[in-house]
């Protein structure tokens, strides 16, 4: 326990909270290039083949990003836009690829929740 004199000389430093999306460097989104596109298995009790991509960002980081939606056209060297947002059952996946921008096409035949998958409003 420090004395009052020690606290006057050297004030306590506030604890800084670590950023959950450090690779974005404070930006809402970042552009990146896919280095590898593959599937991984989720944690127990879930079972699936989740589509993810290893992305090299313009900030210099290489991250693992989730590819949301059914079906995708991404491959190595595809240019994608990445946002923050973890996938609860995939350890280490803290980013998501934004569909409908750059090389990531929108999800086909999507009727509800379209904005999250880059789908335009259907014509009547």
UniProtKB/Swiss-Prot annotation:
One of its GO terms (molecular function) is structural constituent of ribosome. GO terms for cellular component: chloroplast; small ribosomal subunit. Pfam families: Ribosom_S12_S23. Its main location: plastid. Transmembrane segments: none annotated. It is found in: Plastid, Chloroplast. One of its GO terms (biological process) is translation. PROSITE patterns: RIBOSOMAL_S12. InterPro entries: NA-bd_OB-fold (IPR012340), Ribosomal_uS12 (IPR006032), Ribosomal_uS12_bac (IPR005679). Signal peptide: none annotated. The keyword Plastid applies. Keywords: Chloroplast, Plastid, Ribonucleoprotein, Ribosomal protein, RNA-binding, rRNA-binding. HAMAP family: Ribosomal_uS12_B. With S4 and S5 plays an important role in translational accuracy. Located at the interface of the 30S and 50S subunits. Belongs to the universal ribosomal protein uS12 family. Part of the 30S ribosomal subunit. This is Small ribosomal subunit protein uS12cz/uS12cy. The gene is rps12-A.
């Amino acid at each position: 326990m420090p004395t009052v004199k020690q606290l006057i000389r050297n004030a306590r430093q506030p604890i800084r909270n670590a950023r959950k999306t450090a690779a974005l460097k404070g930006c809402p989104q970042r552009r990146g290039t896919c280095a590898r596109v593959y599937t991984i298995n989720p944690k127990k009790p879930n079972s699936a083949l989740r589509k993810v991509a290893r992305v090299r960002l313009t900030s210099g980081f290489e991250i693992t990003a989730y590819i949301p939606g059914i079906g995708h056209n991404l491959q190595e060297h595809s240019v994608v836009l990445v946002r923050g947002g973890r996938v609860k059952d995939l350890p280490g996946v803290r980013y998501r690829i934004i569909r409908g921008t750059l090389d990531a096409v929108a999800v086909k035949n999507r009727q509800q929740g379209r904005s999250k998958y880059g789908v335009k409003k259907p014509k009547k």
